[in-house]
Amino acid sequence: MNKTNTMQRKEFLSLSVPAFLLLANGKILKAHDYFLTEEHRRKVKLRFVVASDGHYGQPNTDYENFFSAIVNRINEEHRKHPFSFCVINGDIIHDDKRHFPAAKAALDKLAVKYYVSQGNHDHASAEEWESIWKMPVNLDFKIKKNSFLIATTSNEAGTYLCPDVNWFRQKLEEHKEQDNIFIFLHINPGKLTKHGVDCPELFDLFSRHKNIRAVFNGHDHDEEGIKIKRSIPCVFDAHFGGNWGTDYRGFRIVELMKDNSVFTYIMNPVDKINEATLFEMAK
């Protein structure tokens, strides 16, 4: 792989081919084969997995097998090289809240701790959500010097919403001394996709916090790469269920390295594709 190819961010909105480095100076570099070696693996200090859009209960889809397949593949990867956690980033079910118990039972077979975000097809009130999943619609947690913020982008009616900016303002202030912040939102809030929403106030806030490393989005089943909004990478993971999108159903693996760079790729669901490395932004 040629490791000298570069392009400016302004000329390149979406990363959808293997092995890229995202640099703080605005350059994007193709990565090289080093990132696929055992030596690379030894330099990983934190590893997690993101999957979205299972759409349990959607008519005329094989949703039970979609869930069992993704759970089995994540568990296989976890046995080989453990994850710290998993995020199921929205649209867990398809509209009918009666599917929540079966969807949760399927996800409870994950061998790794998992968190969930609410998508527009997850029709539940905030109170119902917390009763089902034992976690609120907006939540945060830490692993050493790394923070993780998960927030809803919808409601019981399935409305497309901007995240709660006041909640984010409070949480970003609380986590301002952390080395890295990773954010999980089902719907892209930068209007970078056909089905995204436009949340300029949120990105005004995000742009002031240089420890935000990435925003992870689902929702757009046909989006599998990385898009840039005000120097913040928005990272997509395609889908693992539903009836449209990429021709595979997969999940995204994210690896925080000892040098604080972030390496990420999609499993489709067996092979690595769409690899990229996010270097630390200049503080």
Where are these regions (language model features)?
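N-terminal secretory signal peptides and thylakoid transit peptides that target proteins
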Residues: N2-A24
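Metal-dependent catalytic neighborhoods of phosphoester/phosphodiester hydrolases
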Residues: N89-D108, A124-K134, T193-G196, G225-R230
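Binuclear metal-dependent phosphoesterase catalytic core
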Residues: R42, D62-E64, S68-A69, R73, ...
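Active-site neighborhood of phospho(di)ester-bond hydrolases with catalytic His/Asp-centered motifs
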Residues: A51-S52, C86-D91, Y114-N120, A151, ...
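Beta-strand-turn-beta hairpins that frame and shape the catalytic cleft
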Residues: E39-V49, D140-I150, K176-N180, K227-P233, ...
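Acidic/histidine-rich helix-loop elements
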Residues: V49-A69, H94, A124-M135, E156-C162, ...
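N-terminal active-site segment of His-dependent metallophosphoesterases
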Residues: N25-P101
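His/acidic metal-ligating clusters that form di-metal
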Residues: R73-F85, G158-P233, V262, I273, ...
